[in-house]
Every structure is written in C-alpha cells, then in structure tokens.
Amino acid sequence: MRLTADLINNSLSYLNPLKEREIDLRGHRIPAIENLGVAGPHDAIDFTDNDIQVLGNFPLSPRIRTLLLARNRIAQIQSTLPNATPNLKNLVLASNNIGELADLEVLGRFPRLTHLVLTDNPVTKKENYRYWVLWLCPQVRFLDYVKVKDAERQKAKELFGTADEPTELAKTIKGIKSKTFDVGASSANGAAGSGPSSKLSRLKLTEKEKKKLQDLIKKADSLEEIIRLEKALNEGRLPPGIIAEDDDAMEE
C-alpha cells in the first residue's frame, strides 16, 4: 500500500507516553516514504511493520524527535536525512537489512541522536560493530538498549582514531558499502549511469520486483511514462504495480 495523503490523513495521531505528538503508520506494507508534507508537524512517527527499503524522502521536519522503523526492509539511510530531521533523538531500526558498517556513516551526522537501536540487522554481526557506531556517534548514550560506557568510547578511539585522522582500519571500513541506490547522491552523478536500468541495478529489490520493473520500462510507450518511472526510482520508491501480486493474494 502506498503512503498516500489519504492514508496519512486517516491515521491515528495522539500523544505518546513521552508527551510527543505521534502519528501511527504501522503495518500497512508501505514500500516507500512519501507525501509526509501533508502529515503536519509531529514529534514522532511510527513506521513499524512495513516494507520500507530506503529511510529518507522526508520534508524539512525540525520537530521530529523519534522515528520507529522496526521490522521493515531498510538497507540504506538517505544521505540527506540528517538535514531534514536535525533534531532526531531516538531512532529504532531493529530487524532491517542494513549490511555494512560503512552504511551507518550517515548516523554520525545527527547531532542530537542519543538512543539508537540496530538489533537484528546483518551489520550487528560485523567485527567491532558496537565500537564503530560509538566512534561515528559519540553523542549516543544508549545503543541497542544498553547504556554506553566511557571505556567503550575510549576503545573506539583506539581502534578508529579521530574524524580528522582515522586509522587504517577506519579507512578500510569506510570503503566497504552495500551496493544500494543512493537517492541523495543521484542528482550529483550527472547523466552517466542515471537511467532507469542503472538505478534498477542499485535499488535493493527482490527478483520478482526487478522483473516487473524491467517489464514496465520495456512497455513504457511515452516520454511521460518514462519520466514517471524515473521519478519514482530517484525518490527511492517502487512505482505502482511492482509489488508482487502473489504477495497480495497471500494476504487475502
């Protein structure tokens, strides 16, 4: 189900236990974040139990303090998200698909992030995962529900150095990123490799979704249709008709 203006307007908005104004968008199988401009100002958004692949495409939202995104399919955090949500304090990304330590670099650009949850992501199995996150995010006080210790911060500095003078280990880690489509950087890449086919190779899709998208591109019979597909890919979302019909039938 797409995150339409109607879905947003019909969703429950309430004060949560932290006295934050929260909107409930749980469990709709939303494939991509869009149309949040119609939601109005909120302190917290609950996207738990959806199919979101890219965390991004937020309008400027300085009021947002909490994002709940457990049990999605997130493999990438858009590079522009810290600019859109500069006051984010609590981020829950448990049970997603983040794979490499370098994919977490963007988290270091949230100046007020204090509570971070990444449990049950493949990246948590990487060597030095916890130290890496604490090195990137010195302001984080609770990581995966465990309070950060000063000794851990010191160990992180020993392993990875400083931001200005990173160790060889830090440089090596920074060079290994998942092969996913970077929405935020797409406009800077110029014309080369910017067509739908190259975006398809970098957007993290299932095999069925890839085939459906390839079919849509082949069947596009107008410039307007091609532009529509290009726009959807640039925004990191699946064009209508990509979600496997078999999956919808199973739900019924």
From Swiss-Prot:
<keyword id="KW-0747">Spliceosome</keyword>
<dbReference type="GO" id="GO:0005686">
    <property type="term" value="C:U2 snRNP"/>
</dbReference>
<keyword id="KW-0677">Repeat</keyword>
<protein>
    <recommendedName>
        <fullName>U2 small nuclear ribonucleoprotein A'</fullName>
    </recommendedName>
</protein>
<comment type="subunit">
    <text>Associated with the spliceosome.</text>
</comment>
<dbReference type="InterPro" id="IPR032675">
    <property type="entry name" value="LRR_dom_sf"/>
</dbReference>
<dbReference type="InterPro" id="IPR044640">
    <property type="entry name" value="RU2A"/>
</dbReference>
<dbReference type="GO" id="GO:0000398">
    <property type="term" value="P:mRNA splicing, via spliceosome"/>
</dbReference>
<comment type="similarity">
    <text>Belongs to the U2 small nuclear ribonucleoprotein A family.</text>
</comment>
<dbReference type="GO" id="GO:0030620">
    <property type="term" value="F:U2 snRNA binding"/>
</dbReference>
<feature type="repeat" description="LRR 1">
    <location>
        <begin position="41"/>
        <end position="62"/>
    </location>
</feature>
<feature type="repeat" description="LRR 2">
    <location>
        <begin position="63"/>
        <end position="84"/>
    </location>
</feature>
<keyword id="KW-0433">Leucine-rich repeat</keyword>
<dbReference type="GO" id="GO:0071014">
    <property type="term" value="C:post-mRNA release spliceosomal complex"/>
</dbReference>
<keyword id="KW-0539">Nucleus</keyword>
<dbReference type="Pfam" id="PF14580">
    <property type="entry name" value="LRR_9"/>
</dbReference>
<feature type="domain" description="LRRCT">
    <location>
        <begin position="121"/>
        <end position="159"/>
    </location>
</feature>
<keyword id="KW-0508">mRNA splicing</keyword>
<comment type="function">
    <text>Involved in pre-mRNA splicing.</text>
</comment>
<dbReference type="InterPro" id="IPR001611">
    <property type="entry name" value="Leu-rich_rpt"/>
</dbReference>
<keyword id="KW-0507">mRNA processing</keyword>
<feature type="repeat" description="LRR 3">
    <location>
        <begin position="87"/>
        <end position="108"/>
    </location>
</feature>
